[in-house]
Amino acid sequence: MNIAELPLLTVPLELKAHEMARQLAAVQSTVQKGKRVYLNALAVYAVHRYLKWLQIETDLEGSDSFNQVKTALANVADLVITGIGSLECRPVLPGETTILLPEEVIENRIGYVGVQFSDRLDSVQLLGFAPTLDSSNPPQQIAVAELMPIDTLIEQITRLEEALAFLETDDPVAVQVRSEIETQSRSNIVAQFERIYRTCEDYEWRYAGGEMLAGSTAGGEFTRESADSADTDLEDLAEALLEKLAGIWREAA
């Protein structure tokens, strides 16, 4: 269903939100950057409030968007969802029909929320949600019309929670995956596997998942033969993991 057919969720922006946004904006080097940081902070705060209503724990102060140094260096509007990963909350101004995605927000995100602003800054509307992007071939923007209903964000969080919980088990597949991605963010790996599950046919899982794992575990020197063997092993592991996760997600559906 198109989001235009659904009533949008309105989130009030109280004085506290504006005070926090002003503090971040005040230390920026230009007026333009200060305005950008101000709107980003309000967008993030609105999504934080929405998730708080749903009793989903977030770490507002631990998010880059509420860090004075990081907001000075990058156009970020992230909200850390505790134990899950970072959600990007992009402001949408009146008349805009697309959400531009700065390069710095393509990777390490579990998804994107469009936050509609009006000329008054006393409230915003949550336009909808877009799940994890393919970081190897990312779009530069997301059309507002292509956003999913905001409820799908909760479904996404639940899936990622279930997948991360599986990776903590003693299942042989989980143990092997932990070994392979020891230095990588489990949240990011799980989000990419969820994307593959959602967008690829079953017969594509092996190769798409293997390629993703290969990129996450790249390093060292290989002969062609050893590299081919390693790729096959990673494809086997990716296929096994996706089959496990598919079983968990389908059972919960």
What does each of the following model-derived ranges do?
Residues 1-83, 90-253:
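Nucleic-acid endonuclease domains
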